[in-house]
Amino acid sequence: ETAAGAYPIEAVQTMVKIAESTEASINYRKRFKERTTLVNPDITNAISHACCTTAMDLNASAIISVTKSGFTARMVSKYRPECAVVACVMNKKAYRQLNLSWGVTPIMMCQLEKNTDQLFDLAVDTAEKTGIVQQGEVVVITAGVPLGVSGTTNLIKVHVVGHVLMKGKSINDKVVSGNLCVCKTASELL
């Protein structure tokens, strides 16, 4: 049955059901764990694989890839991570192309920041504003240094979505984090 046939709507509905049931029946986590070696052991591929492994181990809500050409986001996508794959791009061509990649949600970023900390904050804030990630969730971020140069993917950061309201030192000299509740009255403490 084709679009020229007597039942084009039913044909498309059947194709959708087949595609959805096929995607749902594949255990991507198992397939990922069974993969023993990288097919193309270059830096971008290794970083993409490490991002997926880290996201799976930490049950991250998203992998955020700051990418100029979209290549890193596509490399992450090929491993079929369970979490969202967000591609932060600065040009429309890469944005349009990434709309066709499996599991990738491209979002436009208006500017390129001067350092990685600012860039990561902007990428996470942009993903949060679009509703892809929420406060308190863990995300894995990947990008390349020098910033804005295609083909330089070389770093990973694990980040908790939210803004640091205060810093201090724990009793055991280790890094800790937690939720902070700001109360203005004693009754709000309860």
Regions found by a protein language model. Give the residues of each.
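Long, charged amphipathic helices and adjacent flexible linkers at domain junctions
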Residues: 13-52, 152-186
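Phosphate-interacting basic helix/loop segments used at nucleotide- and nucleic-acid interfaces
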Residues: 43-60, 119-137, 184-189
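Conserved mixed alpha/beta catalytic, RNA-binding, or beta-rich assembly cores of soluble enzyme
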Residues: 61-64, 69-74, 78-84, 166-190
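Nucleotide-binding motor/catalytic cores of P-loop/tubulin-like NTPases across gene-expression machines
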Residues: 72-74, 80-115
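Structural signal for hydrophobic packing residues in well-ordered secondary-structure cores
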Residues: 16-26, 55, 80, 84, ...
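Flexible, glycine/charged-enriched surface loops at secondary-structure junctions
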Residues: 1, 22-35, 61-63, 133-138
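C-terminal binding/interaction regions
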Residues: 134-147, 154-157
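Glycine-rich phosphate-binding active-site loops on the catalytic face of alpha/beta enzymes
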Residues: 1-8
